Amino acid sequence: QGAVVVQKLNTNVFPEPQQLVANARKIEQHLKVKRAAGEYNLEIIEHIPSRSNHYSINIQDDTWRALAFIGDSRSEEVVQSAEQAKTAASAFGQFAAALQDFDANSLYPVIANFHNLAMRMDMLEHAVSADKVGRVKDVQEQLDFCRQQIHLVEQLAALENSIPLRPCHNDTKINNMLFSTRDNSAKAVIDLDTCMPGLWLFDFGDMVRTFCSPEAEDSTALDKVTVREDIFAALVEGYIEPLKAHITEQEKASFWLGAQVMPFMIGVRFLTDYLDGDNYFGIKHPEHNLERANNQFALYRSVVAQQETLKALIVNA
């Protein structure tokens, strides 16, 4: 056995850690079959069993697991180039393609309603009504803006039952991709903790959210928070190419909705947490979640402002 990563699972976020590990193990086994058949070329996160042959163990109310370390690799926090965006998006596309014949319903929903925008909007309104820490008076502009975007909820509802449920990664950030330190190629898709049944539009939208802005998601330089068109074009090409044999036309068209929904939804979640007293997302200072919300709303506005160009890139892919 080589180097191992020992990890404590966050049971506040994942109240049923054994289900999380079971999901990840199912995906690991499926990908190993695909790799052996030459249908998946990336490295695979491998769970290491304990001496008693368990893949997670409890020690004093904490749940731990061990994963095989993937060497000669590095991660990125901000996308540096269109080439890098295409490489990462292609890896996430290969991951999705390898799982297209995996039963999405065999995955346990470890975080219920994770990408349920209607529920996220309801949670925001509950936070407004409770006004636990007296912050509602300071965010009327943001609240008005959120309420004006209700059409996104309606558009998602209209899609229900018309596009297939897929096994999704649900956290397709650039830092959940490992690059080779030798040639900058894609090495592995990591962090399978949120793998659940979902829609590919959410994975696409999360890449838009985390790849396209040149600024970090808590940057207060809102005039610089914008969608870099070359990065967007690269991720569209990279993600869709491996999926061409599997994706429906309606699914591909839904990616435009995903590009809008994901920055808006995480903005709603940051704003909700700000009004609730910062209980979910870790903060570095009192206004941190509000700054994050403003940042994500600025990114959403940038997506919408560039609709004509960005939508065409998806349609023509």
Predicted regions and their residues:
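Conserved ATP-binding subdomain of kinase catalytic cores across diverse folds
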Residues: Q1-V4, K8-D122, W200, A216-D223, ...
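ATP-dependent phospho-/nucleotidyl transfer catalytic cores
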Residues: Q7, F14-Q18, I70-K86, D101-H169, ...
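A short, acidic/glycine-rich surface segment
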Residues: S52-I57, E154-Q155, L271
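Amphipathic, well-ordered alpha-helical segments in soluble domains
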Residues: A91, R120, Q149, M207, ...
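Catalytic activation segment of kinase domains across protein kinase-like and atypical kinase folds
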Residues: N161, N175-A216
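Active-site activation/catalytic loop segments of kinase-like enzymes and analogous catalytic loops
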Residues: L201-A245, V261-Y280
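Small/polar glycine-rich anion-binding or flexible loop at a beta-alpha turn
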Residues: K252-M262
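Long, compositionally biased intrinsically disordered regions
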Residues: V303-Q307
